[in-house]
Amino acid sequence: MCRRIVMCMGATCSTPLSTVNAYAVIKTLDEPVVRFVATDQQAEKVKAIDEPLVLNGKLDLHKAVYNHMIRHYNVGKAIALELSTFCDAPAGSGLGSSSTLVVVMIRAFAELLNLPIDDYTIAHLAHKIERVDCDLQGGRQDQYSATFGGFNFMEFYADERAVINPLRVKNWIICELEASLVLFYTGISRESAKIIADQSNNVRAGSVAAMEAMHGIKREALVMKECLLRGDFGGIVESMRQGWESKKRSAKTVSNPHLEEIYDAAISAGALAGKVSGAGGGGFMMFFVPPEKRMDVIRALKRFEGQVSNCHFTKHGTQAWRI
């Protein structure tokens, strides 16, 4: 018999997409087991409640969240439960699905254990679990995007401080963005950790091109913020172009001939700018398209293996409830 059921959902991206969601469901159990299920991956792991949960490549995110929350928030006392998750975006999509899963699992545990932890703490915990406990390389923006939701300008500091500044983007600007953005899933799964490692190694090696590229990406974030607030779509297009060129210069693995072919086809059909989401290398591509050219670009993209999606933004971050 299940005694308690907690459900949680969240969206991701720096401006989270409402069509890309991750869910976590916790059910407490009478039988002395811990069961992890990832329904989108058709994966399941069951362990006796008194057995250690070792990270071995099988549902490690689930295990790491359970271990951390039990150790630090339940005085080490194991709980018999089933933790089930699924995500609309596939792993390697570039939309931060892994980070979002960690965030929603933490939020679900916080609801289960009645923990008074705020959004900053949840995002910080998610970053620690994914980057330290699971030793997965990456940044911090995905965890904060999924936790807070909405349009934000994020500032990260060397001492692990983060400041999340909500942006009051006018509704007409959001509507125009939704009408102008086209998402295309390339079907190419990529290891973001490898690309991020390449970028980090280039910077540590003193590569001038890599350093300039990283500064360029930071600079375009500031430009994009101002353009969003003003509704300067010409500026958004140019910032998107410059940001993509800077990202490609940060590491050779960010792009490849197939992605460039897709990009060129979309531009030829009328798109004004484009980029690969996340670290790069595959996953989702995003294009800025004048609404009157939208169908032309979609037809051009459909010549490639992949999936076209619309773009809708959400104002909400993770949410949890009981039934």
Role assignments for model-derived ranges:
Residues 282:
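Glycine-rich active-site/cofactor-binding loop and its immediate structural neighborhood
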Residues 82-89:
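Hydrophobic alpha-helical hairpins/lids featuring a short glycine-rich hinge
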Residues 95-115:
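DPxDG-like acidic metal-binding loop motif
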Residues 91-93:
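Helix-loop-helix module between adjacent transmembrane segments
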Residues 1-2, 6-8, 15-71, 75-77, ...:
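C-terminal nucleotide
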